[in-house]
Amino acid sequence: MKNLPALMGLFLFCALASVEAADSGPAPSPSPSAATTGAPARDSLAAARGLIAAKRWSAAIEELKRVNATDNADWNNLMGYSHRKANAPDLPAAERYYEAALRLQPQHRGALEYSGELFLMRGDLPRAEERLAQLDKACRLPCEEYTDLKSAVARFKANGNRYVAEP
């Protein structure tokens, strides 16, 4: 009985730790948002996310190359995003990275949204709408990625099936 307070304290600590571990989701990112595949990789991508938020595309690509987490869906999504948004966009490279992200994590909302936008940039409305349908299934409730791609598709259609960058 003398050890009962210590045992109860240990039990409470373990219970709280397991609740926190079960509840820990992906940390919000400056841009682009996406579910993550692992905490260590997420932390190693923080510098690249900061460069992306600052719209320093070339520097972000160099940082991502330095990290070289090719087996991480977020890394591939960020590489695709940076290549697509660069001053001289490299759409084939962006598509390769988005596809790699989706091979690793088929429901990766960021890669689904951004690859849909890439398809609009190429004038490929049917493939963009496929991505929108995939996002509709991936998002249990309306999510930002679905709403953003839906808006991009609407702008595309309203502009005579020509890509219009986000305002």
Please place each PLM-identified region on the residue numbering:
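TPR alpha-solenoid repeat register
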Residues: 75-77, 111, 145
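Long, contiguous interaction/recruitment modules in multidomain scaffold/adaptor proteins
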Residues: 1-42, 167
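Canonical tetratricopeptide repeat
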Residues: 78-79, 114, 148-152
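Alpha-helical segment of the N-proximal tetratricopeptide repeat
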Residues: 39-68, 84-85
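Register position in tetratricopeptide repeats
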Residues: 53-54, 85-87, 121, 138, ...
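Terminal, low-structured helical/coil segments at or just beyond the last alpha-helical repeat
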Residues: 25-39, 129-167
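Structural marker of alpha-solenoid helical repeat scaffolds
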Residues: 67-70, 104, 137-141
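Structural signature of tandem alpha-helical TPR/SEL1-like repeats
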Residues: 54-59, 87-100, 123-131
